[in-house]
A protein has these predicted regions:
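C-terminal catalytic "cap/lid" subdomain
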Residues: 1-269
Length: 269
C-alpha cells in the first residue's frame, strides 16, 4: 500500500454524546485506527471539532452559549479537555500529538501560511500527529466583528489544511454514510453517490442545510470543502464517523462513502 499524507476531519456529532460530553469510546476507536495507519508509514493530520460543545458540557451549561464571551469561554475549556484526551489516547500507542489552533488570517496571509506549512512539515517529519482546530476563542470574535477572514467550519478548515500540506487524501467523518440524492434520514430509498468527478449544479443543489445542533457543518459545507480539496489535487471521502474502522478500506481505495476525485494536475494548472 502506497504511503500517503492523510487529513482526517472528525465532527462534533461523532466525538460527543447528545449532552455534549465526550464520547470516549468513539474517540478510542478513532485513535486506534489513526495510530494503525500511522504505524503503516502514513502521515496523519487530525482536524477535530467539538471544543464549544465539550466546553458547554464541562461548564455545566444547559445549552450552547449564544453570548460571544461565553462561546469563547466554552471553546477554551473544551479545547483543553479534548487535547488532554487525545494526548492520553495517542500516548497509549506511543504516538505524540501537537496542537495547532488556526484562524482565517493564518492561512490567508502568505507569510503566515508559509510558516504554518513549515511547521506541519517539521511535525510530520518527526512522526508527530498534528491535531488541528479553528481557534474558536478568537474566530468567534472575528465572526461577530467581520474584521478578519473567518474559516467558519472545520470542513472548510480541513480542506484548506489538506491543500496547504499537499495531502493525498482528505476524509470527512460525518454522521452520514456519504453524499445522497436525497436525505437518507427522511428518504429511506435515497441513493448514495459512490464517486463524484465534478461538482455539478445538480449535485450542489442536493446539499441540505446544517447538520446536527451540536455542530455547524452540513452537506453544503462538505461540498465546499470538496471543491477546495479536488482543485488542490487531493481526493476527498465523505463517510460515517461511527465506523472509524472504515478508514483502512478508504485508504486502500475501497468503495466506502462518497469519494470526490481530485482533478488531474494538468487540469489544475
Amino acid at each position: 500500500m502506497k504511503k500517503q499524507r492523510i487529513v482526517v476531519k472528525v465532527g462534533t456529532s461523532t466525538l460527543t454524546h447528545d449532552s455534549g460530553s465526550l464520547n470516549l469510546r468513539s474517540m478510542e476507536h478513532l485513535v486506534r485506527a489513526l495510530a494503525d495507519l500511522h504505524g503503516c508509514g502514513n502521515e496523519i493530520i487530525l482536524v477535530t471539532s467539538g471544543a464549544i460543545a465539550v466546553g458547554t458540557a464541562r461548564l455545566g451549561l444547559s445549552e450552547r452559549p449564544r453570548e460571544l464571551r461565553m462561546k469563547q469561554a466554552a471553546a477554551a475549556v473544551g479545547q483543553c479537555r479534548m487535547m488532554h484526551i487525545y494526548d492520553k489516547l495517542f500516548g497509549e500507542y506511543n504516538r505524540s500529538v501537537a496542537q495547532i489552533l488556526l484562524t482565517g488570517d493564518d492561512v490567508e496571509n502568505p507569510d503566515r501560511a508559509e510558516h504554518l506549512r513549515s511547521t506541519f512539515s517539521a511535525l510530520l517529519e518527526m512522526g508527530v500527529i498534528p491535531v488541528v482546530n479553528e481557534n474558536d476563542s478568537v474566530s468567534s470574535a472575528e465572526i461577530e466583528t467581520g474584521h478578519h477572514k473567518v474559516l467558519g467550519d472545520n470542513d472548510t478548515l480541513s480542506a484548506i489544511v489538506a491543500a496547504l500540506c499537499q495531502a493525498d487524501l482528505l476524509v470527512l467523518l460525518s454522521d452520514i454514510d456519504g453524499l445522497y440524492d436525497a436525505d437518507p434520514r427522511t428518504h429511506p430509498d435515497a441513493k448514495r453517490f459512490h464517486q463524484v468527478k465534478d461538482l455539478t449544479p445538480e449535485i450542489l443543489e442536493m446539499a441540505g442545510g446544517a447538520g446536527t445542533w451540536r455542530g455547524t457543518g452540513g452537506m453544503a459545507t462538505k461540498l465546499s470543502a470538496a471543491r477546495i480539496a479536488m482543485e488542490s489535487g487531493c481526493d476527498m471521502v465523505i463517510t460515517n464517523g461511527a465506523r472509524p474502522e472504515d478508514l483502512y478500506g478508504i485508504v486502500e481505495g475501497q468503495d466506502i462513502g462518497t469519494r470526490c476525485l481530485a482533478r488531474k494536475k494538468e487540469d489544475v494548472l
